[in-house]
Amino acid sequence: MFPTNSTWDQNATTFANQTQIGSDPIGLYIDTNNSIYTINKNNGRILIWMNNSNDTNLILYAQLSSSAYSILVTTNGQIYVADSGLIKQIIQFSNSYSNQTTTIATVSSDIYGLFVDLNNTLYCSMFDGHQVVKKWLNSNSSAMATVAGTGSAGTASNMLSYPNGIFVDTNFDLYVADRNNHRIQLFRLGQTNGITVAGNTSPNLTISLSYPTNVILDGNKYLFITDSNNHRIIGSDENGFRCIVACSGQGSTSNQLNVPRSIAFDSFGNLFVVDQNNHRIQKFCLSTNFCNRERKKQRFDIFI
C-alpha cells in the first residue's frame, strides 16, 4: 500500500523497447520476486526478467500466436497465457524454465484479462463475449462459470462491453475494466449487478475515462487504472482520483504514452506501463525510492 499523495517521476525510463518485445505489446505481469513477464507477439515468445534484473535472462520459445494478449504467474511459479489465435485457449506453462504446456480451457472469445484469486480460481475476461468467467484450477473440468456480464454488449449494470483487465480482491469482489462503456465496474461476490466505481456513469463522477484497459488495487483498495485513449494512468487515494503519470497527452517522449494497455507495480512501488503504440515498456519510479538505486529502500505491499 502506498502513502497518501505518493508521486511517481514524470519522466520514465524505457525498460524494454521494440527490438526486445516486438510491436504492439499488450500483456505484462510482475511477480512477488520482482520478476517481469511479457509476450513478444511477433515471435510467440515469453520474455522474463528474473528477480529485478535489467536484462532479459529467460526466454520461453512458446510458439504462441500473434494474438496472445494476457499473461499471469501464480505464487507457485506456473505461467498462464491467454492465446486468442485460431484456437482460443488458456495455456499453462509448468514453470519459468519449461516449454511444457497444458491447455486449461478452450473458449469462444478473445481474452484480454486473466487473474487468479486466493482460492486458486482463474478468472478470464471474454472480450467479444462481453463476460467474465471463472474456473477452479484444482478441478480437471474445463467448464467455465459466468461471474459478470450477460454475453451481449450493453450499458446496464449487469452488462459489459468488451471487458479488458480484471482484478479480484481478498473479499473475492471483482473489478472489471469495462472498456467500451468507459468505466470500471465492481461486482461484489455473488452479485450480477455491477457498481460503477470510476468512469463516465459513476454516481460520484470525479474522473472521466476513455476505453480503460486495466485496473489493479493496492492494499488500501485504492484503484490504479490504465486510461488507454486518454493516454494516461489514473490513481486514487483518500482524496479521490488523479492522473499520476503521462498527464500531458498523447506522445512518445519520456513523460508521454500512446495507448497504454497494461500496468504493474514492483514491490518497491515503481510503475511499469506497456505503451502499446510506442512499442515499449516504460518504468516510472516512485519518487521516494530513487528507482531502487538504494536496495534498502522500503518495499510496498502493492496487491491485496
Residue ranges of each PLM-predicted region?
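Blade/loop signatures of beta-propeller domains
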Residues: 1-11, 140
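A short beta-strand motif characteristic of beta-propeller blades
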Residues: 13-19, 55-62, 99-105, 145-156, ...
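Beta-rich, blade/repeat-based domains predominating
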Residues: 21-33, 64-79, 107-122, 156-173, ...
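Residue position within the beta-strands of beta-propeller blades
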Residues: 37-39, 80-83, 123-126, 175-177, ...
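Structural signal for beta-propeller blades
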Residues: 44-47, 87-91, 130-133, 182-185, ...
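Short loop/turn segments that connect beta-strands within beta-propeller blades
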Residues: 50-54, 93-98, 136-140, 188-192, ...
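Solenoidal tandem-repeat scaffolds enriched in leucines and small polar residues
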Residues: 99-193
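Blade-level signature of beta-propeller repeat domains, shared across WD40, Kelch, NHL, RCC1
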Residues: 258-304
